[in-house]
From Swiss-Prot:
Subcellular location: Cytoplasm, Cytosol
PANTHER family hit by this protein: ALDO/KETO REDUCTASE (PTHR11732)
Effect of residue 304 to A: Decreases 3-alpha-hydroxysteroid reductase activity about 500-fold
Signal sequence extent: none
Species lineage: Eukaryota, Metazoa, Chordata, Craniata, Vertebrata
Record comment: activity regulation: Inhibited by hexestrol with an IC(50) of 2.8 uM, 1,10-phenanthroline with an IC(50) of 2100 uM, 1,7-phenanthroline with an IC(50) of 1500 uM, flufenamic acid with an IC(50) of 0.9 uM, indomethacin with an IC(50) of 75 uM, ibuprofen with an IC(50) of 6.9 uM, lithocholic acid with an IC(50) of 0.07 uM, ursodeoxycholic acid with an IC(50) of 0.08 uM and chenodeoxycholic acid with an IC(50) of 0.13 uM. The oxidation reaction is inhibited by low micromolar concentrations of NADPH.
Name the record gives this protein: Aldo-keto reductase family 1 member C2
Active-site residues (renumbered): 55 (proton donor)
CDD domains: AKR_AKR1C1-35
Involvement in disease: 46,XY sex reversal 8: A disorder of sex development. Affected individuals have a 46,XY karyotype but present as phenotypically normal females.
GO cellular component: cytosol
Annotated positions for site Lowers pKa of active site Tyr: 84
Length: 323
């Protein structure tokens, strides 16, 4: 197993590569870019590819994975692919059809990991963010424990090897963990996590429950309005990260990625730039000292780039709690 293929064992016995490739891109980026980027990522040594129904790129991502299998670069079992259930399909009877739709778009037989993407439910239908005539989001009321039972059935059916959640706080995780008749625990919780928002409390909670924390926006975030405040600080320009990058002869992005691996976090690196995709797999080639780790810990300032506050209001909105 090459060094680029380090894995963590999940609570269901499956293995997840600790470095993943994120595929989300703002709407104006042509979908063809996802196809090229995923091919480049697999060529560079990424084995873990993260997407979602709502990213609207699973056809391209699936094509990229299948083309790298077809040309002999990788086998299907060497790719760890994650998809996610969007909020318009939380009703239990809609969960499996949503996964089957992703599989059809991907033209794959199974996903390695299927996540509840976001805990707030919206009305079912084709619209991913359904709104009324006044522009108000049409929320739905769904018991996420029932959604979870439908996720468990997807695992039993072999459509997803592992199941987990994303954007859950510790209260919502407890709700699933304490569910009567729980068959499978979530293997992971994928959340925003980076040196400016290091999620220490949530990380400790997840570790105590044998749930892996997976970091998105690990390099800060895209600056896409209206999702991200354009005035928020740019993580990769941080003087501490830049000084460490200079010292290690690496990039600030690599320092931010390495930081997560050393604290036991699985990290997603999103880039559509060929040079940076190749650079990001160098995360296994160096180590940070405990002093350097402490210095990065000290950067935490609870800056959440992606507040998703258009979904605030319903009790399952996850970001009002401390963690």
């Amino acid at each position: 197993m090459d060094s680029k293929y380090q894995c963590v064992k999940l609570n269901d016995g499956h293995f997840m590569p600790v470095l993943g490739f994120g595929t989300y891109a703002p709407a104006e980026v042509p979908k063809s870019k996802a196809l090229e980027a995923v091919k480049l990522a697999i060529e560079a040594g990424f084995h873990h590819i993260d997407s979602a129904h709502v990213y609207n790129n699973e056809e391209q991502v699936g094509l990229a994975i299948r083309s790298k299998i077809a040309d002999g670069s990788v086998k299907r079992e060497d790719i760890f692919y994650t998809s996610k259930l969007w909020s318009n399909s939380h009703r239990p009877e809609l969960v499996r059809p949503a996964l089957e739709r992703s599989l059809k778009n991907l033209q794959l037989d199974y996903v390695d990991l299927y996540l509840i993407h976001f805990p707030v439910s919206v009305k079912p239908g084709e619209e991913v963010i359904p709104k009324d005539e006044n522009g108000k989001i049409l929320f739905d009321t769904v018991d996420l424990c029932a959604t979870w039972e439908a996720m468990e059935k997807c695992k039993d059916a072999g459509l997803a090897k592992s199941i987990g959640v994303s954007n859950f706080n510790h209260r919502l995780l407890e709700m699933i963990l304490n569910k009567p008749g729980l068959k499978y625990k979530p293997v992971c919780n994928q959340v925003e996590c980076h040196p400016y928002f290091n999620q220490r409390k949530l990380l400790d909670f997840c570790k105590s429950k044998d749930i892996v924390l997976v970091a998105y926006s690990a390099l800060g975030s895209h600056r896409e309005e209206p999702w991200v405040d354009p005035n928020s600080p740019v993580l990769l320009e941080d003087p501490v990260l830049c000084a460490l990058a200079k010292k290690h002869k690496r990039t600030p992005a690599l320092i931010a990625l390495r930081y997560q691996l050393q604290r036991g976090v699985v990290v997603l690196a999103k880039s559509y730039n060929e040079q940076r995709i190749r650079q990001n797999v160098q995360v296994f080639e160096f180590q940070l000292t405990s002093e350097e780790m402490k210095a990065i810990d000290g950067l935490n300032r609870n800056v959440r780039y992606l507040t998703l506050d258009i979904f605030a209001g319903p009790p399952n909105y996850p970001f009002s709690d401390e963690y």
